[in-house]
């Protein structure tokens, strides 16, 4: 029952998580919708069993009864007897989003859960759009937090913001090379830098590979951030630190993930599409791309000659303190 439907539920797919929804509740909702779809499928024909039933003797006018072998359907597998065929599914969740954040969230069903581990090991970058609001600071870096101070921002310009973003990107790119454990003078490091495939080989602090301002209309501004090993709270703190470098203050009003590895907004299923058929189609559509990208990253990893690492490479400081290290260059 539903074996064909279950066979197509093996792989990775992406959904769009709205703000205000916990990832755990999202996973439970998707699981319930999948179970509902699987159990609603037409069940196979029941098995036939031979039973001896009383019946009239054929060709006889006398009212005599005899036992006759008769094929009858077996009800042991009927859903009203056994209950629903599927009662739970194991669904894995990729790089998670906190309650306030929204955007692309990768989920896995069946053998796709092992592919999530491959995604983690590939250290793929993720894209975010982050909205900020100048002029105030709160205790949790969010607009709804407890107000700590209000500041003026008339002196803030787009050019000054762009300079600070350039400092952040430059410092994090240096840290990225360091955590990749590459020989900075080698041809390999140069070629990987040109291809844009330099990635850390182990755990590291949040690393930003790209950051730019998409929109600037004080007090509001919109940033695009490409990063890895981040949390959404770290991105909110980044907005706060940018405000300090601008000699004012800032809070984060939105964190939205637009890409997670090889899944983008176009791949993410909206809430109205969280059903069996849409998810099956999404898994089938993504499967060739997932296999190709993971194979590509595996080849890069095998071809990467990793140098010995002892703690933080070459005495590098935490790149989260980038602003303090090089703030003077943005002034």
Swiss-Prot record:
Residues 319-331 have a biased composition (Polar residues). GO terms for molecular function: pseudouridine synthase activity; RNA binding; tRNA pseudouridine(55) synthase activity. Its EC number is 5.4.99.-, 5.4.99.25. It comes from the Eukaryota. It is found in: Mitochondrion matrix. The keyword tRNA processing applies. It catalyses: a uridine in mRNA = a pseudouridine in mRNA; uridine(55) in tRNA = pseudouridine(55) in tRNA. Signal peptide: none annotated. Keywords: Isomerase, Mitochondrion, mRNA processing, Transit peptide, tRNA processing. CDD domains: PseudoU_synth_hTruB2_like. GO terms for cellular component: mitochondrial matrix; ribonucleoprotein granule. Residues 309-331 are annotated as: Disordered. One of its GO terms (biological process) is mRNA pseudouridine synthesis. InterPro entries: PsdUridine_synth_cat_dom_sf (IPR020103), PsdUridine_synth_N (IPR002501), Trub2 (IPR039048). Forms a regulatory protein-RNA complex, consisting of RCC1L, NGRN, RPUSD3, RPUSD4, TRUB2, FASTKD2 and 16S mt-rRNA. Minor enzyme contributing to the isomerization of uridine to pseudouridine (pseudouridylation) of specific mitochondrial mRNAs (mt-mRNAs) such as COXI and COXIII mt-mRNAs. As a component of a functional protein-RNA module, consisting of RCC1L, NGRN, RPUSD3, RPUSD4, TRUB2, FASTKD2 and 16S mitochondrial ribosomal RNA (16S mt-rRNA), controls 16S mt-rRNA abundance and is required for intra-mitochondrial translation. Also catalyzes pseudouridylation of some tRNAs, including synthesis of pseudouridine(55) from uracil-55, in the psi GC loop of a subset of tRNAs. Belongs to the pseudouridine synthase TruB family. This is Pseudouridylate synthase TRUB2, mitochondrial. It comes from Mus musculus (Mouse).
């Amino acid at each position: 029952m539903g074996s064909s439907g279950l066979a197509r539920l093996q792989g990775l797919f992406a959904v769009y998580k709205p703000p205000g929804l916990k990832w755990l509740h999202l996973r439970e909702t998707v699981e319930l919708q999948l179970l509902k779809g699987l159990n609603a499928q037409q069940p196979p024909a029941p098995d036939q069993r031979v039973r001896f039933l009383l019946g009239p003797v054929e060709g006889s006018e006398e009212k005599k009864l005899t036992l006759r072998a008769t094929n009858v359907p077996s009800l042991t597998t009927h859903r009203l007897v056994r209950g629903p065929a599927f009662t739970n599914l194991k669904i894995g969740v990729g790089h998670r989003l906190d309650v306030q954040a929204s955007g692309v969230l990768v989920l896995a069903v069946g053998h796709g859960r092992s592919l999530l581990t491959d995604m983690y090991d590939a250290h793929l970058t993720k894209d975010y759009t982050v909205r900020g609001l100048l002029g105030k600071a709160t205790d949790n870096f969010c607009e709804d937090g407890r107000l700590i101070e209000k500041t003026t921002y008339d002196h803030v310009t787009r050019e000054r913001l762009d300079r600070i973003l350039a400092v952040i990107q430059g410092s994090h790119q240096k840290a990225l090379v360091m955590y990749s454990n590459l020989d900075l003078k080698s041809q390999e490091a140069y070629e990987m830098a040109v291809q844009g495939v330099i990635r850390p080989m182990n755990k590291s602090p949040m690393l930003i590979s790209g950051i730019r301002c998409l929109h600037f209309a004080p007090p509001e501004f919109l940033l695009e951030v490409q990063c890895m090993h981040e949390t959404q709270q770290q991105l909110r703190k980044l907005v706060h630190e940018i405000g300090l470098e601008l000699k004012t203050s800032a809070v984060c009003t939105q964190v939205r993930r637009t890409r997670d590895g090889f899944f983008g907004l176009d791949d993410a299923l909206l809430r109205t599409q969280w059903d069996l058929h849409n998810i099956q189609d999404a898994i089938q559509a993504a499967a060739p791309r997932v296999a190709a990208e993971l194979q590509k990253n595996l080849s890069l990893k095998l071809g990467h000659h990793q140098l010995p690492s002892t703690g933080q490479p070459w005495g590098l400081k935490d790149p989260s303190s980038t602003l303090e290290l090089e703030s003077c260059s943005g002034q």
